[in-house]
Amino acid sequence: FAYTGSAFIATKEANADQGYKQGIVDGDASGIVYTNLFTGVHGNYLRSSIENAGLDPENLPTSDPSKMNFGSGGNTKAKAWKDIWGSGQGVGAVKSVGTVEDMVARMEAEYHDARASLGQKSSYRIWEA
């Protein structure tokens, strides 16, 4: 089981700001900041979007979780999702803005390559559906 979200933000079909898409492409796991400042719930955000909002990612205050507001920016002028962009640690695997079709084809090819590699390195038989 796996899930992906950030990779789909950086597609031509996504209705996301071009800066957000480029932030996904340029980002990696070290550029993710985990904080509850922007909504009251801890989440992962692109460091570059926090810096672009004039905030210091290393010195963010903690938000009061009893005051959750998913449309706010915490006690900042920046707004979550509009100015402060969420992202997962998988951003390092996104190398360019492309189509959903190309991304899914690449993921499928990577899956088959990994599966074949596991079969060669293991005495276990790969289950066939």
List where the protein language model places each region.
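Conserved active-site-proximal phosphate/metal-binding subdomains
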Residues: 1-129
